[in-house]
Amino acid sequence: SGLHALIYYRFSHWLYRHHCLFLARMVSQFARFMTGVEIHPGATIGRGLFIDHGSGVVIGETAIIGDNCTIYQGVTLGGTGKDHGKRHPTLEDNVLIGSGAKVLGPFTVGANSRIAAGAVVLDEVPPNATAVGVPARVVRVNGRKVDSDMDQVHIPDPVSQELCRLRGMIEQLEKEVKLLKTNKGEGQHEDL
């Protein structure tokens, strides 16, 4: 269905560019009915887009898709309803978007980036990055893991940190008490 959706899109986009807006929308709505893929005729799509198992894919009017991108089923390239003018995302070349991901807003997803299945992307993604989660966060750039303040596996334990601090204070107090006992035995009193 992805190939057929793109064939219909190319025709509806041609109509759209030639100011036959009503016919362009008719063709795109017919394509949505036939393929389950909704591509607005105003969207700009480069060469080599692959829509795999396309059912449920939605591509908004001001979306721009570069060359050789891959989009899986259930992906939305949409707006948030807060913006005017350019409302939809721009995908640079060689971007892959996993099943069910939502990329919402007028920002850029950099070249060679990957968006994980089910991610909700609301902010810019740099080139050569991998973004995951809801809301999406970048976890890899250029194949290297990115440190995250919200790493749920290695997040600092505040109770453990407090216990360590208290142990340190106890050790310091024990040293001071020992020093006081030593000084008292010698008959000297020293201010600490």
Stretches found by the model and what they are:
Residues 32-139:
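Structural signal for interior beta-strand "rungs" in well-ordered beta-sheet cores
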Residues 86-89, 93-98, 102-103, 134-192:
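C-terminal segments of enzyme domains that contribute to small-molecule binding surfaces
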